[in-house]
From Swiss-Prot:
Binding site for ATP: Y51, K91, N501, G538
Quaternary structure and interacting proteins, as annotated: Monomer. Part of the FGAM synthase complex composed of 1 PurL, 1 PurQ and 2 PurS subunits.
Pfam family, one: FGAR-AT_linker
Protein name as it appears in the record: Phosphoribosylformylglycinamidine synthase subunit PurL
Protein function: Part of the phosphoribosylformylglycinamidine synthase complex involved in the purines biosynthetic pathway. Catalyzes the ATP-dependent conversion of formylglycinamide ribonucleotide (FGAR) and glutamine to yield formylglycinamidine ribonucleotide (FGAM) and glutamate. The FGAM synthase complex is composed of three subunits. PurQ produces an ammonia molecule by converting glutamine to glutamate. PurL transfers the ammonia molecule to FGAR to form FGAM in an ATP-dependent manner.
Pathway it works in: Purine metabolism; IMP biosynthesis via de novo pathway; 5-amino-1-(5-phospho-D-ribosyl)imidazole from N(2)-formyl-N(1)-(5-phospho-D-ribosyl)glycinamide: step 1/2
């Protein structure tokens, strides 16, 4: 220990700890911490691991539900009962800062890490989704980031053998230097095969399994807990390096090891590596049984590089590693399974009953820390920051009169916007059909759906967030993120079940950012309570800022929602696109129309306006129930919600998103409003709570009857045609298209915007 640097306040501050936190550490230990102990505390008390600036707010979210098998934060991921002795494990997490400095590996290891969280619970990953944000595609650096992130996600997922079935991608200037890479994994497990991330049972051996430990990723958790800057490029060593083929072996070996019954507890080594897995598993054991702890000997840890210090071994975030607590006397069964798969499994310590995390290296005790003092809910600090509302300084749009506009040209221009245009270039790089459970190709249903083999059921899943709405109105925007996710799932015929979230915000020490965070969480909570979709867990990513106009600017607040839903009978699945000519087109929902927050307003007037669209959560809940009922009774042939771009874009997407079955439409919108901008609002408003369905003409009466029962306005606005597309308002044509015109505008605009030929 004498070779370690002298620990003092200055060194602690260099590790991201403040004076008060350093004093608390000294008080807990009753002495000055060793250098290794300082490193352990610095990562465990970082924002990334401790949630110290967010946990007080997160505790206000609904976390109870009849179908939940674990509460938020109890385990590596949420666990939801779906009947037939099956449960869904699912979670979403961010890998933003690593992807900003090393996009390929940053994104790839984000995929690997979230899948490990799922299979360490005993579940087999069956699908993944993503939610991505980048700056303007005009920026060469942004194009480099997009290319690296998309390839990283695709290469890791394809090699690992889990389909990437859905996601979203948006472009806004505020993400130029700070992209967001949020990845969600979904897995299935039989109830009796689940595993807890808990260390208990004095004398039970502790094993490290998987890849050897190197110097990659050291202080990755701390890196994720600070602002990005030009100097962040120097922190490429903080970005881990992934190996999907090693993870595939680790997956199969782990599920087989669990089947032996010899595994007591299991946790992924993600952020903070060996430090977080030992301390968190110890703390859970203490909480559940009253005593626990772990003692390890780092000399037994397989190291990738010579001369690694205790500090480096404890803080390394080398990928494809896990910590296992085995039943004493049966560890050889686990080791034999991993050996069969050519995966390392080594006993490095044991469970104790003195409530300590004890680390030995070269015959010395280099760390001896009360385990609960390290973790969220234990000794880790909790802060409530100042929150001050700061209204966006975006001007209201000065709308021009409808009669001066070319609505055909505007509609085609809107379809070619990167935020709306086809994302085929992205999802064609992902294998969405591996495992043969995916029901429809990407983009043909409002939420991805996979079949649950051995049953008639389907599992729907979606990620959603319109960050612009949250920027304009954090509370309403947070609620809309949940509402649209649930609406998308209900459009497939599935009932929304539960939520995981990934909360991406700026610096929490800035009062206006903390206000955005608190308000968005309040909106999310309101929506989840209304829909009975509890929060099962997730991730908070602060310190997301970019350099714009010579200063530091926070990203748009982006509380990404990941949601799952259950389709009782896969035969009742409803697709997004028109199914057959002659069907009636019905618009469900009739909110007051506004252009605030819309893509059209940004495109045409250079401002998002002054507020988000309004959201009526009671209406949304009834709309979800209606859609599920209509699907179960087979009364509708398609359903697609009205969102980005408004009704004109929704109709176009229903026409062209299925390239093998493109159909047209004739729509006539009734409008009693006499104002001179009514047509713009009819076509391009992103007012919430609306869905366009197509229905056999003979079933329209039954559909309207069901809608009336739930107080959902519904009216026929047109019909599906074999070819051509037209929109009229009050009988007056305002836009007519050939299907090929819609497809040309929508189909390859993203590739053109990204100048892919230059990559």
């Amino acid at each position: 220990m004498s070779t370690e640097p002298e620990v003092n306040l200055k060194l602690a501050q260099e590790h991201g700890l403040n004076e008060e936190e350093y004093a608390k550490i000294c008080e807990i230990l009753g002495r000055t911490p060793s250098f290794t102990e300082l490193g352990i505390y610095s990562v465990m008390w970082s924002e990334h691991c401790s949630y110290k600036n967010s946990i007080a707010v997160l505790k206000t979210l609904p976390r109870d539900g009849a179908s939940l098998l674990t509460q938020a934060g109890e385990e590596n991921a949420g666990l939801v009962d779906i009947g037939d002795n099956l449960a869904v494990a699912f979670k979403i997490e961010s890998h933003n800062h690593p992807s900003a400095v090393e996009p390929y590996q940053g994104a790839a290891t984000g995929v690997g890490g979230i899948h490990r969280d799922i299979f360490t619970m005993g579940a087999r990953p069956v699908a993944s989704l993503d939610s991505l944000r980048f700056g303007s595609p005009r920026d060469p650096r942004v194009r480099y980031l997009v290319d690296g992130v998309v390839r990283g996600i695709g290469d890791y997922g394809n090699s690992f053998g889990v389909p990437t079935v859905g996601g979203e991608i948006y472009f806004e200037d505020c993400y130029t230097g700070n992209p967001l890479v949020n990845v969600m994994s979904v897995g299935l497990v039989e109830h009796h095969k689940t595993v807890s991330a808990t260390a208990w049972g004095k004398g039970n051996p502790v094993l490290i399994v998987g890849s050897s430990t190197g110097r990659d990723g050291i202080h990755g958790a701390t890196f994720a807990s600070e602002d990005l800057s030009e100097a962040s490029e120097d922190k490429r060593p903080s970005v881990q390096v992934g190996d999907p083929f090693a993870e595939k072996l680790l997956l199969e070996a782990t599920l087989e090891a669990i089947a032996t019954g010899a595994v007591v507890g299991l946790q992924d080594m993600g952020a903070a590596g060996l430090t977080s897995s030992t301390s968190e598993m110890s703390a859970r054991g203490i909480e559940k049984t009253g005593s626990g702890g772990i003692e390890i000997d780092l000399d037994l840890t397989p190291a990738r590089e010579k001369g690694m210090t205790a500090y480096e071994l404890m803080l390394s975030e080398s990928q494809e590693r896990m910590l296992i607590v085995a039943e004493k006397g049966r560890e050889h069964e686990i080791i034999d399974v991993y050996k069969k798969w050519d995966v390392s499994a080594v006993v490095i310590g044991q469970v104790t009953d003195d409530n300590m995390l004890r680390v030995r290296h070269h015959g010395e005790v280099v760390a001896e820390i009360p385990a609960t003092s390290l973790v969220l809910g234990g000794g880790a600090p909790v802060y409530i920051r100042e929150a001050v509302e700061k209204k966006p300084d975006t001007p209201a749009a000065d709308l021009v009169a409808d009669d001066s506009l070319d609505f055909k040209a505007l509609s085609l221009q809107l379809l070619s916007r990167p935020n709306i245009a086809s994302k085929a270039w992205v999802y064609q790089q992902y294998d969405s059909m591996v495992q043969t459970n995916t029901v429809t190709p990407a983009g043909q249903t409002d939420a991805a759906v996979i079949r649950i083999k051995g049953t008639k059921k389907g599992l729907a899943m979606k990620t959603d967030c319109n960050s612009r709405y949250v920027y304009l109105n954090p509370k309403a925007g947070g609620a809309i993120a949940v509402a649209e996710c649930a609406r998308n799932i209900a459009c497939t015929g599935a009932k929304p079940l539960a939520v995981t979230n990934c909360l991406n915000f700026g610096n929490p020490y800035k009062p206006e950012v903390y206000f955005q965070f608190k308000s968005a969480v309040e909106g999310i909570g309101d929506a989840c309570r209304m829909f009975d979709t509890p929060i099962t867990g997730g991730n908070v990513s602060f310190y997301n800022e970019t350099s714009l106009g010579g200063g530091r600017t926070a990203i748009y607040p982006t509380p990404t929602i990941g949601m799952i839903g259950l389709l009782d009978n896969i035969d009742n699945l409803v697709e997004s696109t028109f199914r057959k000519a002659g069907d009636a087109i019905v618009l469900l929902g009739a909110p007051e129309l506004s252009l605030d927050g819309s893509e059209y307003l940004v495109m045409q007037y250079g401002t998002p306006g002054t507020d988000s669209p309004a959201v009526d959560l009671n209406h949304e809940k009834n709309l979800q129930e209606l859609l599920v009922t209509l699907a179960s009774k087979k009364l509708i042939n398609s359903a697609h919600d009205v969102s980005d771009g408004g009704l004109a874009v929704t109709l176009a997407e229903k026409s062209i998103m299925n390239r093998e079955r493109m159909l047209g439409f004739e729509v006539d919108l009734e409008c009693s409003c006499k104002e001179g901008t009514a047509i713009q609002k009819q076509l391009f408003s992103e007012a919430q709570g609306r869905v366009v369905i197509s229905v056999d003409p003979g079933r329209v009466g039954a559909v309207i009857e069901e809608a009336d029962r739930l107080n959902i306005p519904g009216r026929v606005i047109g019909k599906v045609t074999p070819e051509g597309a037209s929109i009229a308002v009050n009988g007056k044509p305002v836009a007519e298209f050939m299907i090929d015109e819609l497809l040309h505008a929508y189909g390859h605009a993203l590739e053109s915007a990204l100048h892919l030929e230059e990559l």
